[in-house]
Amino acid sequence: MKILSYLNVSNVDDIESDSGYIFNYTIAAEFLSKGIEFDIIVPQELSGKLNKISSGHQHFIKMGHTKYEVRYNFAWTEVKKLIVQMHPDIFFLNQAELTSHVKALLVETGLDKATKIVSYCHYPALHISAMGETCVDSSLDNGGLAEDIIGNLYSAVNIADLFFVQSHFAKQLLENYANAIGYKLKKEIMVLPPPYDNRLFQAPNNAKKKNTILYNHRLYDSYGTKEFIEFVKKNQDLVFLVTDPMMNRGTDRSRYNISPMTNRLALQELDNVKILDGSNRMDYIQAIDSCKIAIAPYRRACVWSMAVIDCFCRGLPVIGPNFASFNEIIPDFLRYETVSKERLLVDKLLREPDFWMDSVYSCKLLLKRISPSTIVEAIMYQIDRIM
């Protein structure tokens, strides 16, 4: 079997911390170990930089960089050339908004029956309003584009042979909004969490743990960073370590949203916060190891958090709010409804060794369900069903 995967890259400047890249090199290794040919289409700027993926399985083309380019730019001629050369059995599309482009290309080449499209939606352009209703994500609505992006995702559900999202919460978001606008989904949205990154287990753990609280998420306003800043301000007796994966963010991306820079500057003003560059993977892992607990993002529409899973892999318990996909990721006794309960959980984890150990154990239980081999087996099961 031949699989041709189209990479989604949201962070070309810091590729080591890009979730789409991590997802693809993780499943690529598993597919190749099973004797399945797995090639990846990647942005040409990354030529020579992707040492986690065999060079014989990389194809470099011109792709988008910004959040809109990646959703609208499609190198038709270059992708067509690869498909005609390879005749893949599966086109694994990690930028689901481009599904209709791929389908049209397959129709034109006469390969629409031979090549199946598997679309993986890494990020639905939806959010939760203050009233608790599903709404468009304002961070993807510059110029009113969010509705079109969502429409392309719904088109992908109906066109792709398989359409995956990361969590039941992500599926619920898409289905709820489709019902709200009267859009008929003709096919099933399937749930498939991203696998954990094997490198998190392979790295040695030499760091000495301190009573420090880790926050290892992007600093967008939409991630709830301002709520985190308020929590830090109200708890000056606690020490926080923030790993920012976007310190090298390019100006072409920053002009759409300056909140990561604004929030980073606000955190730098606080005496109980230290900020590290989270884009280097080994430095990032050492930062996780040095902390006692971690806090999930405060994002009300969080469809998954690979950063939370990173902590689980390194034996670090994570607390988080009792909403969104955290109900599927974080043990119930580590979720909170109020800021006061959040503080109580922090104190308990810092002061009670037995509770901390029980929390580590419970967090690690999830990992059995999302190992790379388990996730690839689940993908193969669904692929076999449509072939």
What are these regions (language model features)?
Residues P353-I386:
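A charged, aromatic-enriched C-terminal amphipathic alpha-helix characteristic of glycosyltransferases
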Residues S254-I285:
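Nucleotide-activated donor-binding/catalytic signature segment of Leloir-type glycosyltransferases, i.e.
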Residues F164, N205-Y223, I229-N235, L241:
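Conserved donor-binding/catalytic core segment of Leloir-type glycosyltransferases
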Residues I90-F92, E108-L145:
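Active-site proximal beta-strand in glycosyltransferases
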